[in-house]
Every structure is written in structure tokens, then in C-alpha cells.
Amino acid sequence: MRVLFATAEAWPLAKTGGLGDVAFGLTRALAELDCDVRLLMPAYPGTVEQLEGEVRRHTAELAGEGVTLIEGRLPGTGVGVWLLDDPPLFARVGGPYATAGGDAWPDNHWRFLRLSQVAAALAAGDLLDWRAEVLHGNDWQTALAPVFLRDRADRPATVFGIHNLAYRGLFPAELYPRLGLPAELWQPEGLEFYGQLAFIKGSLVFADTLVTVSPTYAREIQTPAFGWGLDGLLHHRRDRLFGIVNGIDTATWDPGSDRHLVAQYTGPDDRARAANRRAVARAVGLSEGEGPILGFVGRLVEQKGVDLILAALPRLLAAGAQLALLGAGDHRLETALRAAAEQHPGQVGVVIGYDEALAHQIEAGSDLFLMPSRFEPCGLNQLYSLRYGTPPVVYPTGGLADTVVDVDAHPQSGNGFHLAASDGAALAAAVERALAHWQDRPTWHAIQARGMAGTYSWAASAQAYQDLYRQVVASRG
């Protein structure tokens, strides 16, 4: 199976969020299944230098303009990479989507229109001596690719990955006539979205198959609460909408060999947990006691339920718990967390920013992991927590609902704890339930063991994607 995986980012070349991790983990796992997967992304500053293998430059022509592709290998994998080398669009100081100051690049419509054009042409065999059977686009930055292929009988099958529907690629209507897109598609059944241009509709309407990052999220985005105004369209396409849970890098996230831990372990181990708890306490400024540590690692934004942690804080501390939090984000929430740490020295430890080693230590040294996200398409931290024997406390949405089983609802298979509602009181109640089990060590060890025994690698996810590719190719005859 020949697959072109088109993305705006891929770790370690460039990464701003979960899409970068997926692009690396999924393509590597597909290659290990003997899938001929190639990755296309822009050549941002510093990306070419990271390519492995023989690096070659290809030139071609598309719509009267030159196209330059730099070929190499994705570091640490057998995945071929083509970098779209277009310096006026992509060789600039800042991030893939925004300036160093955080403002969206004013020409993002041109930048990712071009990426979509090149993805379509490359997949169709118009640029190089290679053509894809499947074009797998990801998020709004590559979503226009199926538009450029829609009238071609010889086109590849098209699959579109929705990683977070909140990002729809919205642009002012007055840009539409300048982009060379078909005039007849400026309508609600095409690319128009309440008076704006929505790049993401290029794939939501025209891709053969849609896939998102968990079965529950695939259902949720068909509802007004999670659909961002696109729920009607997604419900209309529900027979071609699937959900596959992301995997994690189980070599990097392995408590048995994790170099960031002071004590490694392969199963429930109170002595190793105690050593790792002491390391976390020292790192974030907690007093070293016997009480449970509640961990949090993530963006400090309301989507992640950080305000719920603050609301639940009095009850959590009254239950004898300590909190270890690592993250950055909303200035208001950062300020509130710093104030909580000052008000409760030794009980609340906060590190603003991101530290990879500390993230691993919090997963291994906490007794519970808090993840009360209001919505979470898939989520990774709950998978890290399960693998590290740190039962997660989650609001059951998206991938959290698909991967975390409530202990009290399912005593024989439970591996974590669900909030009954998305509020601070429900979070406190869920933690109190969890701590009642934590006091019973044999029961707690069984909960930990079930989480650690789960399958979280990319191998199973990649097999599901390969099966989906075969289905969509077969459905096109």
C-alpha cells in the first residue's frame, strides 16, 4: 500500500502539538507493517538539516510554477520524507503557523493552499515517479487537497484525519476569489462557512473517508456541543466517519527503562513509587510526607479543566492530598496556580513551563493523574499514566472515555476514575473515591496492574489505519 501522509508538522522536524507526535508515531508504525508510506510537510528553518539518509532535491512544475521537494528520511524511522521547499512561504523565523509573538501568519491561506496543492499533485503522480494509492491529509492545513482531486478519475483514495475540530482554517470571504478555487464551491455545500472560507470543509465534504482520533470523539463531533458548527455535515457523513485511538511511543514512555526516573519498575511497586514521589516532591517544592500526590501535566487552559482543579483544591487538600502541576498557558490560570502554591506551601507545587524529564517524573511519582478536560479528542497523558501505573481521573469525553474505565462502575476491568460532571465538585468527589481505593493497597495494586497491562503502542493503531486504507481503496473499485 502506497500512502502519502500530508501534514504541517512531524516530530522531530517540527512540532507544536499532538499532530507532530501522530505524524511521527503513525508513519513509523505503518512503515514497520511494510506500508510504503511517505510524508510530505513544509521545509521550515532547520528541518532539512535533520533529515537522515541520502538527501536529494527534486524540481517539477505545478500550475505554471516551480515546485522544489527535498527528499530524505524521517529521523529514527524508515519513513521517506519530502519537504516542500518554498522559502517565501515557509523559511521564516517563528512557528509553523504563527510569528514568534504568537500572531497567526497573515498569509496562512496562501501557505497551506500551496501545501494542499502539492499534496494533491504528488499523490496523483504529477510531480515525481511515484503515486499514492491513498492520500492521508491531516487537519485544516492540508484539507484542500481533495478539492484539487475531486474531478479526476485516476485520483488516489483520500482519507482525512481530524485531530481537533476546533481548528477549522477560517479566513475572510474576500480572500476566496484570489485563491483560484472553483467559484461553484462558494456555497454552504462547498467551502463557505457562515460567510467565511473554511479550509477544513475541503476534506469534510470531498474526502472519501474521515477519521478522527477516538471513537467517542467521532460521535461527539456530530453534536452541537462538540461540532463547532460542522456537526450537521459530519452527521450527514457519519457512514464515512471513523475513530481510531492514537498510540504512544512505548520505547520513550516505559517505566521499566525510563532514564528520567530515579527508580524504574515494571509493575506495581510501592518502593519505586515512593522513591519517584520523593523526586517529584523535591522538584516542585512539596513537603515529603506519606499523603498521595495528584499530578497534572499539560497546557494551562480551560479546555484542560485547570479551573476545575482550582475549584476542587480545598477539598483535595482537606483529603490529605498534595498537588504537583507542570504546564504553561493562560496567564490568568498561571497566576492563580502560583497564588495557590504560595498560599499552600509544601502542599501545592507548580512549575510554569515544560520540562520533559519532570513530565516523566510526575507520571511515575504521582499516585493519581488529574485530567479533567472539558473535551479531549484523544489525549496522550492518560495513556502515559496508565502505562506508568498512575490511575487517571478524567471527565469521560473523547479519547478519555475510550481508554479510561471507571473502577467503581467496572470493578473487574477499571483502570481509573470518571468525573460525574464537568465541575470542581465532581472532580473532588472522583478523587475522594479514588483515595478510598488507594488506602486498600491490594485493590490499588490490581487497578495499577490493569492499567499497566494495556496495549498503548502505535502498532495496533497502525494496523487499524492500514485496514481503513484497504477499505477505502476497495470501495472506489
From Swiss-Prot:
Highest taxon above the source species: Bacteria
Keyword vocabulary terms for this entry: Glycogen biosynthesis, Glycosyltransferase, Transferase
GO cellular component: cytosol
Chain sites annotated for binding ADP-alpha-D-glucose: K15
InterPro entries: Glyco_trans_1, GS/SS, Starch_synth_cat_dom
Enzyme kind, highest EC tier: transferase
EC number: 2.4.1.21
Sequence similarity: Belongs to the glycosyltransferase 1 family. Bacterial/plant glycogen synthase subfamily.
Function field: Synthesizes alpha-1,4-glucan chains using ADP-glucose.
Name of the protein: Glycogen synthase
Gene field: glgA
